Amino acid sequence: MKASGFTPWPQEMAQKYRDAGFWTQQTIPEMLEASAQRYSECVALAAGEQQWTYQTLVEQVDKLAAGFQHKLNLKSGDKAVLHLPNVGEFYLSFFALLKIGVQPVLALPAHRYSEIRYFCHFTEAKVLITAPQLGVKTAEIAQQVAADLPSLKTLVWAGEESLMPTGAQALNTLFLEEVGAQSDVAEDFAFFQLSGGTTGTPKLIPRTHSDYLYSVSASNDVCQFSARTRYLCILPAAHNFPLSSPGALGCFMAGGMVVLAPDASPQTAFSLIEKHQITVAALVPPLALLWLDEAARTQQNIASLQVLQVGGARFSEEAAKRVKPELGCTLQQVFGMAEGLVNYTRLDDPESEIVTTQGRPMSPADEFLVLDEAGNPVPKGTAGILFVRGPYTIQGYYHAPEHNQRSFTELGYYRTGDIVVMTEAGNLQVVGRDKDQINRGGEKIAAEEVENHLLAHDSVHDAAVIAIPDEYLGERSCAALVCRAKNPKAIEIKRFLRGRGLADFKIPDRVIFVDVLPKTPVGKINKNKLLELI
């Protein structure tokens, strides 16, 4: 079933990817079923005290797919928002929805009312699947969204029934013996991921079975995942990095074992590494720094760890050099985006490349350009904006013609917004962004979105949100406010933003008050000048 609002690859390009074997006819649930045939009694997934073998996982997915279909009356083409922490129910729901052709929106645990309501409204989702999160009123968020949106027919609760929102249905009551129908074909639009974006409107990224499975397969080839791989999922399971680079799907494809971490603390992670003999883990730079600090004092044995992937933001050379001597494993830098392109340092790259670059594209079919502002190619060693197209890089955002016009060229190249330098060896060094976006430890914050919320405050006349350098997170956010009369307290501003349902990571780390915001000659806020003043 071809979805409206989805931009397909041009036929000539799509045929090239089929002929090369990059795109196959396998769907994501069929990939899991194929692994279950080969590794039926092997443990596929561990979460807390629960474990699923490949056979059990497939059986549970089938039963849940039947429940979604027959109890909730979901059908192919419907949308569902998944707002789940790192629990086994995330993968059960993800595979089950795909199996019957329902297209999940993979919301992140950090998203709150504002974002969840938007995802449900924009996609006309029929169901919201959520669960308890420590310190988050997920039940209240779900009830409020459901009250706002008549199109949202069902709330599904994947947690203790005593905490369940009124009117919700418990996920554990949905498992049926009936067989759910298969989704359509591999090149159909399968699910949504989310772009950090630079505007106040989150952009939805449509992925197909074919392009996503190729991304996973190519990642496995580079990262050498196998049935012996034991992957620790610390980052949010819904995020592209731990889902497909190679992530959990790569582990399932190879017949390995995925272990879910209930929180991101290094103490929890090190305990799980020792317990399950973890071989691979993926982190963002701030977590990697915490691991390096914890390694000096831990009593846990983490000698099984062979590879530590670090991505999501620039990892400093100084920190990168510490990984091998202090953690005893190989560092693999990862630079990618939910829109597609993934770069890896190779496991056998020289140490000098591993610690100073963010890798190179993983596929021979990745076509990339490094251009100046005028659109001219720049030589190696010179910074430019990265453009890319290929068999797993999307051709457009979902129902977003204005964004697509700005973000994609006529030839189908995606303008990443990343400023990079290509080394003589062909690796990329990420040196910045050309978009008004803050990268707070791997979490992308659109300055415009936060500014729009700030301008809704009665006291705020003008607002600018900028990135300020931070040794730990890479960047932190700072809001500079011009107020109408008496300046409110910074804590009041933060409380106001939380009250509007903004995710915690988007709340400015610092709030300052100024008499006037510096402007460019054409009247726009001069954020470079503002940063100098701060």
Predicted regions and their residues:
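Conserved AMP-binding/adenylate-forming core of the ANL superfamily
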Residues: 22-25, 29, 33, 41-75, ...
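Conserved AMP-binding A3 loop
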Residues: 53-55, 190-214
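Conserved structural elements of the adenylate-forming
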Residues: 58-66, 205-226, 234, 288-292
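Conserved AMP-binding/adenylation subdomain of ANL enzymes
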Residues: 101, 213-230, 240-280, 294
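Structural core segment of the AMP-binding/adenylate-forming
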Residues: 102-170, 484-486
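AMP-binding/adenylate-forming catalytic core of the ANL superfamily
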Residues: 111-118, 128-133, 390, 395-396, ...
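Gly/Ser/Thr-rich phosphate-binding loop
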Residues: 278-282, 294-353, 367
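Conserved ATP/PPi-binding loop(s) of AMP-dependent carboxylate-activating enzymes
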Residues: 361-365, 376-407, 445
